[in-house]
From Swiss-Prot:
GO cellular component: plasma membrane
Membrane-topology descriptor: Multi-pass membrane protein
Name of encoding gene: terJ
Swiss-Prot/TrEMBL induction comment: Expression is under the control of the terrein cluster-specific transcription factor terR.
Purpose of the protein: Efflux pump that might be required for efficient secretion of terrein or other secondary metabolies produced by the terrein genne cluster.
Annotated protein name in UniProt: Efflux pump terJ
Residue positions the entry lists as glycosylated: N79, N466
Principal location listed in the UniProt entry: membrane
Family: Belongs to the major facilitator superfamily.
Signal peptide: none
TM helices/strands, residue ranges: 43-63, 82-102, 112-132, 135-155, 177-197, 204-224, 244-264, 272-292, 311-331, 339-359, 364-384, 400-420, 439-459, 477-497
Amino acid sequence: MSRNDVIDDEVHGVHGEYDDSSTLTGSHEDLDVKRPQSLSGEIAFIVVVCMAQLVSQAGLGQVISILPVLGDSFGIGNNMSQLSWFPAAYSLTVGTFILGAGRLGDLYGHKLLFTAGYFWLAIWTLVAAFAESSGPVFFCCCRVLQGIGPAFLLPNGMAILARSYEPGTRKEMVFSAFGSTAPSGFIFGGLVSALAAKYQSWPWGFWFMAILEAVCGIAAIFWVPRTPTPRRETTHSLWARMDIAGCVTGISGLLLFNVALNMAPGARWQDPYIYILLIASLVFFGLFGYIERKAVFPLIPFSAITPDISFVLATLACGWAAFGVWVFYGWEFVQNFRGISPLFACLQFSPAAISGFVASFTTGLILQKLPASVVMMISAAAFCTADTLYATMPIAQSYWAQLFVSIIVMPWGMEMSFPASNILLSNAMPQEHQGVSASLVATIMNYAISLGLGFGAIVETDLNKNGTDLLRGYRGAWYLGVGLAASGIILTMFFALHEYRKSVPMKNKAASREEYLA
């Protein structure tokens, strides 16, 4: 029995009653994606898929870079509890809808959902550009709907790559290329918006991004290979195969919890609806867990999530929540306290793109040489170092002293955690669950950013003395990021201990076998 067959039995045999003939899928051979054979075709394919990560992160950077401009445009000034909603609303829907989008890709083909994601993102980016005269509420709604586009792009794009390459160095380098576009995408989105705000008006940046996303969607039609859909079985209904009950309860729980968390700073925990939303989210989480245990085709195949994967995902969540705090308050710091324009701020943050590129491909080279626990520990240390440099940074200081170093260090946390966690899950999951595998990583990464913004806003508003001491609030948020990243370091230590305990019996068994043969 092959390794994939063993994993397939673990995933589908939750109740011990389903074999390959009664599952959603056919053979693994039928599911393999045939990537372009020519070098130019393969490069074009990789570029189109990597652009999904770039435009997804650009959607975050295009508002964070011009938050003061948006505050003035919508008449809300520097109210951080309201401004934080513009990036948080986007990350919220990216993180919550990814799981369902990955399952749809598993059912109906990853290319179809991937291409649709580009066009959906283009449409709502275009609509958001017309929100200038409609107010912040309409703009925030557009941001929510914008986030659904990357929710379809990211898991299905990663699933396409995972199904196109066998485990090995080539696959790791391709995933590293995909991950390397995250920092550059953020900077690119910020630069586009900053240029538009300086020379025209901020909606021009959204119009440009909408055109780029539409072009990528057209390119995906021609350059992304066909992804065969699994053989349909008629034993179970679409409701069961899609796990609609799990989708509804899981997404509802994630949405309500995050909305409550991000609205709490503005309400200062005094309005009862905050607690109602929190309680409702916990109820939905409980229902989700119960439904998934009973589901024939669970949205999250918990049986396939080993302790190793759990440690990796928990570390990923801590690190990316720390990143959310780092990037949001870092950008606000340089503009509000150092008087830097959005355009110049983009230039100051631009070394992150180069650092991210180097970090990503370095990670691709060392993943086969270092244990995953070591890679994740380095990642967590980078997250912690970057936030610590921000938290202790004075206003009057050279750019090269702490700000530059922090900007160089942070991408190593991002780029080491992203491909490592993706490759671990991709290799551990069978082909038909690559969408779910990719969804878990992308869900945690993006949802953690939104959670980090929510927790950061709670700390910041509690410490800023009713807006009279913004710097104190910013530092409090950064120290929260330090704590989150430090938690990730502790988790990786437990992960390393777990790996060591697993390796000892295997080494003893190998030694005994050698003695016997001798």
